[in-house]
């Protein structure tokens, strides 16, 4: 029998590697009545559910609703597949193990909008383009991109943070006010469909699910929910003593990835649910992120592995 190895020098913040079982214990010496062990793409890991949270990122109408994100092709989109994996397996598994569910969403205030840096304003569309969606002088003032990585965004949707989307046709003669882009309490910034129902059902005191750990909806004003110091998410995690984070949502390489890497730098344990995340970015973006998470920032697992985690 080989001796366990401590990873880290801080007496309150360390892991333990158990070579005989190839398991990394992330519990930091805390006692748990029901620690769980789950498989990842590398080691098996052991976590304390009481110190863990499933962070579901940006599953909002703006990013998912077919009224503003029409499907291309016949099959389900990557985001739809991730949504089903979470709804059918990932979220129920987290609840069954007693893991807190955090809904991390864009939800801007007027102050956020007035202090938003230009880089983020550009991301969501703020300057004029030609009707074709291409810059009039493209090729004259920019370098070539090979392969072509220039993304043509829908100008009806990407019209600028805080800009009113106007009426949104939901089908069957049903129309809703889309509201201002990603502003708090607007339709477009609300949780999408089944995720909204899932959140509200958990918050309902009559629901017989995880009453001791109600879901929490936390707003963010950047791609990362943990940027800077003292974010709403960071304050909540510190108050609850949460040290292990399982990540899901959209987009893998943008808001999910930004929050994950900030969490890694702040010392949280980072676990990516690869089938519970998605992105529309081509060029193998998801695989690159999974590779980096597995080899550098933490661990990669699946919703099924979470469901089948042993106690």
What are these regions (language model features)?
Residues 61, 108-109:
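Short, solvent-exposed loop/turn segments at secondary-structure junctions
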Residues 110-114:
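Short catalytic/ligand-binding loop motif for oxyanion handling, primarily in non-cytosolic enzymes
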């Amino acid at each position: 029998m080989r001796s366990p190895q401590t990873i880290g020098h801080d007496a309150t913040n360390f892991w333990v590697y158990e070579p005989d079982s190839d398991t990394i214990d992330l519990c930091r010496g805390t006692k748990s009545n029901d620690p769980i062990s789950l498989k990842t793409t590398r080691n098996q890991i052991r976590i304390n559910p009481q110190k863990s949270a499933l962070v579901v990122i940006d599953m909002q109408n703006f990013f998912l609703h077919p009224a503003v994100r029409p499907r291309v092709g016949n099959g389900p989109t990557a985001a739809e597949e991730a949504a089903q994996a979470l709804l059918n397996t990932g979220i129920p598994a987290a609840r069954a193990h007693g893991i807190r569910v955090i809904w991390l969403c864009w939800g801007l205030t007027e102050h956020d909008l007035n202090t938003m840096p230009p880089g983020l304003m550009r991301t969501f569309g703020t300057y004029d383009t030609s009707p074709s969606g291409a810059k009039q002088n493209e090729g004259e003032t920019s370098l070539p991109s090979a392969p072509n990585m220039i993304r043509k965004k829908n100008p009806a949707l990407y019209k600028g943070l805080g800009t009113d989307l106007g009426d949104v046709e939901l089908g069957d003669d049903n129309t809703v006010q889309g509201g201002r882009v990603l502003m708090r309490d607007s339709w477009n910034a609300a949780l999408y469909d089944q995720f909204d129902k899932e959140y509200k059902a958990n918050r309902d005191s009559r629901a017989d699910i995880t009453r001791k750990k109600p879901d929490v909806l936390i707003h963010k004003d950047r791609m990362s929910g943990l940027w800077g110091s003292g974010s709403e998410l960071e304050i909540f995690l510190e108050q609850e003593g949460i040290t292990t984070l399982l990540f899901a949502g959209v987009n893998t390489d943008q808001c999910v990835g930004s929050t994950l890497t900030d969490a890694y730098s702040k010392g949280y344990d980072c676990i990516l649910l690869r089938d519970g995340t998605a992105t529309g970015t081509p060029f193998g973006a998801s695989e690159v992120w999974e590779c980096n998470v597995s080899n550098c920032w933490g661990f990669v697992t699946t919703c099924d592995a979470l469901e089948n985690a042993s106690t």
